[in-house]
Curated annotation (Swiss-Prot):
InterPro entries: NagB/RpiA_transferase-like, Ribose-5P_isomerase, Ribose5P_isomerase_typA_subgr, Ribose5P_isomerase_type_A. Its EC number is 5.3.1.6. The gene is rpiA. PANTHER family: RIBOSE-5-PHOSPHATE ISOMERASE 3, CHLOROPLASTIC-RELATED (PTHR43748:SF3). Pfam families: Rib_5-P_isom_A. HAMAP family: Rib_5P_isom_A. It catalyses: aldehydo-D-ribose 5-phosphate = D-ribulose 5-phosphate. Belongs to the ribose 5-phosphate isomerase family. It comes from Chlamydia trachomatis serovar A (strain ATCC VR-571B / DSM 19440 / HAR-13). This is Ribose-5-phosphate isomerase A. Homodimer. GO terms for biological process: pentose-phosphate shunt, non-oxidative branch.
Amino acid sequence: MSKQPENSFSSDKFFPIKQKLALEAVALVEPGMCVGLGSGSTAREFILALGDRVRTERLVITAVASSRISQLLAEAVGIPLLDHSLLQDVDLVVDGADEVDPCLRMIKGGGGALFREKILLQSGKRNVILVDERKLVPTLGKFSLPIEIAPFGCSSVQRILNKQGYFGEWRETSAGERFITDNGNYIYDVRTPDSYANPEEDMIRLLQIRGIIDVGFVIAKAEVWVGYADGSIVRKKKHNEY
């Protein structure tokens, strides 16, 4: 069984870089916007920074959170949240990623919120992904590939995955219990293969399996802001976007 990644926050030596990325991104927020809030340690810093602006500037916005954890944090810092069922267009989505390749394809889902995160990205008019330099990889696969799977028939789905060459383990909580997503599903973390030269093909193949809700690959229109140890930030985006 794989363990759910733990949050280290301020103990992370890249914490100042995450804070700087968050402060740069929060400057994009304008009055009246609907803002998509991602999940994970860098998204957490963005939510905190956005809460500061809402409080000190009386900034009028609405937001949609991609996970229960992000929702609770947003509520705690005074960010007004939109009912998930009313989600339509989102002016700005800010999130993180577990891996980013040179084509800006990503793996997400280390926190188990991949399905909702991808819905937000799909709805976003502008998507900004914040990562530190450790997340840049030549080929996706160094980080395990999370797959969200419905509980019904999950062992059968695992058998099919293994038959097609995807091997991994079910994610557990720190207490040793099966991890359950905010949608009531399980996460299967694929360890093998450990390299995806054509993630688009793998994603299509995996989504054809009944019982799979979503896959951690993100092939989406998004800017990627990379923070480096020297304090610099490089903004990357695909050609002809935005």
